[in-house]
Amino acid sequence: MFRKLNLYKCICLYKLKDKMETLPNEIARRGYLELILGCMFSGKTTYLVDTYNKLYSKFNIKVINYSGDTRYHSTMLSTHDKVMIPCIFTNTLSDVCEEKYLNNIDVILINEGQFFPDLYDTVCNLVEVHKKQVYVCGLDGDFKRAKFGSILDLIPIADNFIKLFAKCDSCGEKAIFSKRLTNENDQVVIGSTNYIPVCRHCYNN
């Protein structure tokens, strides 16, 4: 699994290291949305964990993960190489993002955003009404390269968009797609062993 995490990364628009560490007052007043997208094994959750580690000593953070994604731990958000941070598991974001739960929260990290049916409306409310700093990571397409949930709908309202890449499991080139290894046709089939990251050539051959 470690070889798959030899990542290619492309950060679009501008670098955010300083902003992530300080969250300037003007950002806090207006809200902020960052999207982290990519194929399987591209380091999306690792990026989210790194964001948490940069911010947790200065800000109150809520980490949310999809309840169906308990492959590595039942109460912690985990990367493929088992780096973990505390999180809340839920099927719908509205359950844990009501106003009464947000009073002391500065930053909200959402993992596997493509799975949440209420992602768009909830994130818009968090950023533009409650002025929270929200980071959402997820797949930019399913195994058929089709739109997955409503995560792509957030691009027009995002402050920043980051596209991550993996290493092709077949040839070693830059991977941009998730190829399913099993025969299920359902869009949602959770499990890292069911997929490999592949480049365009290997996806089509």
Regions picked out by a protein language model, each given a short descriptive name:
Residues 10-12:
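Cysteine-centered motifs
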Residues 21-96, 142-153, 166, 189-204:
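Conserved P-loop
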Residues 35, 107-109, 135:
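Structural motif
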Residues 97-105:
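Short basic/glycine-enriched coil/helix segment immediately N-terminal to the Walker B
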Residues 105-116:
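Conserved P-loop NTPase "ATPase switch" module shared by AAA+ and STAND
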